[in-house]
């Protein structure tokens, strides 16, 4: 094994390919925090969880479970190494335990049911289905639990102050997995993970951005821990890690069929805190000490845009503010849910109708947005209104074209010819008696889904008249 990058006979790419393949599976499995915060889009306020419940009793076991028990005995040793890497001293001890897959699934359900009511979960599912991001007949909660219970192989619970190791994790992955979770315990002692993990009502994009800090920091520490164990020097780690997140996720996808088959909205939400978070932490840290990331915990990014483009975090660029009003033209519709999609989810949404690269480019000019769902009694799917602001009019035109392709896709009319860029005051397609439409006014872009066809023009005019989207500008972090 080489002792530094670029050593004779072994390239930097080969070294990190080895590390990446070794860690690809557990990289997606850490942190109950992000696994729950990311897929759920931020509806509802969190209720404090009990902190007095004892950790599960550790039973004697065999095979991988026995290995998990043995690993728990190495917590103190691994903690010392993590503290040396990251520089956050341990303020107090934390409990530790081993959970079966069934026990972890129960913990996942407990956490989600505590944070979200059945009505909130149902409302979120209906909006995702109207957006075309979930099959209409999908059981959203079942999909969520199946994916999470398969991926979560260990976690630190900030409510119980307890670190858990899964009994099925292969032994060669357990030490870096434990290093990641120990870092979460240290984060909790210094920055209060309960505060960062608490669902943010109507701010799912901001919640994902905060999750990226927590998981990006944990993943970067894990990578450095693994690199040192392989004899690799860490001086150039920030530079390498700043480009490694996407490669790591591609490796994880290739070894995890369930992720490949999962709806893109769940897959991207689950992966984002680790992949983009790793690259964000590495880019912000650059050649600075780890204390630079301590400052990020105290003033975390407020949007996935800031995570995807660290320069926008460093310059303090803030999302646009979107204000709304009731739909007087459709008084029978009542508000169901609202949320900020953010650059990441616009990319996911646009990618339904075009390549991921083109969707990423179209979403890159995102400035701010708000998605509001309206429901009428007796209807299966809600009416959606998505108003967004874009950095420049050119960016808005590019997003408008992506939205037109999306509307064609949602209505089964992808073969229709698109109008010239920026030349359609109202782009509308129909599915039965429902309209899906796109309209732009300067840097503001409107997408409506599921509007009664006879009301489309009236609804669009009302939204541009009574709703608004304005840039906030820059606020130094």
Model regions and ranges:
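Active-site recognition of the HExxH zinc-binding catalytic motif
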Residues: 82, 176-193, 218-219
